[in-house]
């Protein structure tokens, strides 16, 4: 018997709830996103649902249910125990240097595996994959080589479109809507390595606490969700950063400043990036030990990842470890090994 009538009836029920401003349960969100990510929803149904959720505001339960389906549909890759991810939603429109990508090399050099989930540029001139390509990393390397660099070199780049093939079903409606949707939040929650320790940057402060609660429901061990008061989806050095920490079943809210870990406060202009070639050159200089605003913000974000990894107890200790990894040339060596491994024939 065809499941089409059942699917149509469920979509009508869900769309009817969303149309009147009612929230979906986690189970209902799972059901509707299973239909969507399986290719069984029409473009009109997808667009209507996404816009309805956006206008009303997505709930913790809805985001959790949708993320569960994204994770279930992903092409998985096995990561070492204790791996972390440092990732942002994008969409902050700040056009900064590739902060979390640079921080990934530093964290790996400190002995913590990083399963870096990323994509091409969204609101900047250079996304993670763009700058890695400019650095010489083969982002389309065979999965065997990605696995090798993740396990042997402690950093691997997981190119989102390669792992989330089901996203093709929503590409058309998302593009036509031309506005942020729940999928802007789902990417950082859907690491195909299943990392349970994360630093997640968000484009708006209102998502800091809710996404920490989502990560908890999804099985996180230790996570920071961060938003710079300057608008960055990273920990910022221009002022305070709002943080929601999930650990041990609890969410704790606090702020951090660069000064409290011995870093200089920067001006927003100091953090601006350029195209992928410009950012790659800046990253090479940073990893060779060049001082300045780029280094400081990378150190701060690496420090947060070291905290959630359990490598250090305090952000200050993390900052000192990150600085040492750069100054000893260890972070630069991680990049060079990643370039070599990903360009080999598996």
Curated annotation (Swiss-Prot):
Entry cofactors: Mg(2+)
InterPro entries the UniProt entry points to: Anthranilate_Pribosyl_Tfrase, Glycosyl_Trfase_fam3, Glycosyl_Trfase_fam3_N_dom, Glycosyl_Trfase_fam3_N_dom_sf, Nuc_phospho_transferase
Keywords noted in UniProt: Amino-acid biosynthesis, Aromatic amino acid biosynthesis, Glycosyltransferase, Magnesium, Metal-binding, Transferase, Tryptophan biosynthesis
Signal peptide annotation: none
Gene Ontology BP term (one): L-tryptophan biosynthetic process
Pathway entry: Amino-acid biosynthesis; L-tryptophan biosynthesis; L-tryptophan from chorismate: step 2/5
Binding site for 5-phospho-alpha-D-ribose 1-diphosphate: 88, 91-92, 96, 98-101, 116-124, 128
Top enzyme category: transferase
GO cellular component terms, A-Z: cytosol
Subunit structure: Homodimer.
Primary role: Catalyzes the transfer of the phosphoribosyl group of 5-phosphorylribose-1-pyrophosphate (PRPP) to anthranilate to yield N-(5'-phosphoribosyl)-anthranilate (PRA).
Protein name in the entry: Anthranilate phosphoribosyltransferase
Organism: Paramagnetospirillum magneticum (strain ATCC 700264 / AMB-1) (Magnetospirillum magneticum)
Gene name, Swiss-Prot/TrEMBL: trpD
